[in-house]
Every structure is written in C-alpha cells, then in structure tokens.
C-alpha cells in the first residue's frame, strides 16, 4: 500500500461520535507511550499528523485519520497508564473495549508492543481479547532501534511464543523507518 494523502479527520470521546462505517479501519492500540502517534507519523510521512508526547496518557480520545480518501487509521487511547484517576481509566477502558467489540468496519488491529518490554500482561490480555472476538491482528514491535541484535532476536522469540494467532509481527523503528515497507505491504490484504 502506498500512502499518498493523510489528514486528520476527527476525534471522538464516545461511540456516538464515530463516523459512518464507510471505509475499512486499521486500528492502532497499545500501552501508553508505546509509540502509536510516532508510528502513525512515520507511516504517513506527515510530521505532526498525530500529536506525540513524552508524557504517557496523552491520547485520551479515539482519533481518526483519513488515508488516501478511502481508509481510516484509528488511534485508540493507550492502556496501562497508572497515573490517571480510576474513573478516567475506566472510561478509556470502556471506550476501547466497546469500540473493538462493536465496530464492524475494523479490518485489522495493530497491537503495538515496546520491543524493550515484550509480552507484558496488558499486551497479552489485549491479544487474548482480540482472539476471543476473532479480530485479525498484527503485532508491531516498536522502538526497534533501541535494541542490540541479540536483544531484538530474544524479544522477537518471546513475542512469538505469546502470539501464535497474530497475522504478522513487524519490528519497527519510527526513528529510522525500519519495518515501514513491510507493514504497508501487510495492509494490502486488509484494505482491498
């Protein structure tokens, strides 16, 4: 898949604000500060399209980006961030779960996992949830540039042991662009 055009479409705080289900949706989900926004910016080649922050929990809404006029990339709030209040964490969790359960337009879910901390309990729970719902998902191991070759191989093996039903695993670096072409090629199977 080649990305020709990428624009911010809308943010929503409740399922009632979601756009019509006219385009396939590729969903980006992962722990807080795993690099979802950086990955979106890297994939699209549009710096600042998705707002990035070194502060976990920055994304608090469901953010839609229209790609090539006929696909949505959907950035969900991160899970696992402890510094927000219980009520806010419950709201994010309910929004995330309800969206994944009910949205028919979801073509693929990308579970972003920090390569330095593979297979954390919250990531395994997300994969189990997606498998329970029979949602196709791929795993993106982010921050690949921060690992040595030996660490990278060990992290990949560990991730593979927990994700037998993943459609693919891609090691990705938003800094260098490593994995970008591979990931975009996978999208072809889910957006046609």
UniProtKB/Swiss-Prot annotation:
It comes from the Bacteria. Residues 22-192 form the EngB-type G domain. One of its GO terms (molecular function) is GTP binding. Transmembrane segments: none annotated. GTP binds at residues 30-37, 57-61, 75-78, 142-145, 172-174. Keywords: Cell cycle, Cell division, GTP-binding, Magnesium, Metal-binding, Nucleotide-binding, Septation. Belongs to the TRAFAC class TrmE-Era-EngA-EngB-Septin-like GTPase superfamily. EngB GTPase family. This is Probable GTP-binding protein EngB. It comes from Chlorobium limicola (strain DSM 245 / NBRC 103803 / 6330). The gene is engB.
């Amino acid at each position: 898949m080649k990305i020709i055009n990428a624009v911010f479409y809308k943010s929503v705080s409740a399922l009632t604000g979601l756009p019509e289900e006219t385009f396939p949706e590729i969903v980006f989900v992962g722990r807080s500060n795993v690099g979802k926004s950086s990955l979106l910016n890297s994939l699209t080649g549009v710096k600042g399209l998705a707002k990035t922050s070194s502060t976990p929990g920055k994304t608090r809404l469901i953010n839609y980006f229209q790609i090539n006029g006929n696909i949505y990339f959907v950035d969900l709030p991160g899970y696992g961030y402890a510094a927000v209040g219980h009520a806010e964490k419950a709201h994010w969790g309910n929004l995330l779960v309800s969206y994944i359960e009910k949205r028919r337009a979801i073509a693929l879910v990308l579970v972003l996992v920090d390569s330095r901390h593979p297979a954390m309990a919250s990531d395994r729970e997300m994969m189990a949830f997606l498998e329970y719902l029979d949602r196709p998902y791929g795993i993106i191991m982010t921050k690949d540039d921060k690992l040595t070759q030996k660490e990278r191989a060990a992290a990949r093996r560990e991730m593979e042991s927990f994700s037998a039903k993943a459609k693919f695993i891609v090691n990705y670096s938003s800094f260098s662009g490593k994995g970008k072409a591979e990931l975009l090629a996978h999208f072809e199977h889910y957006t046609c």
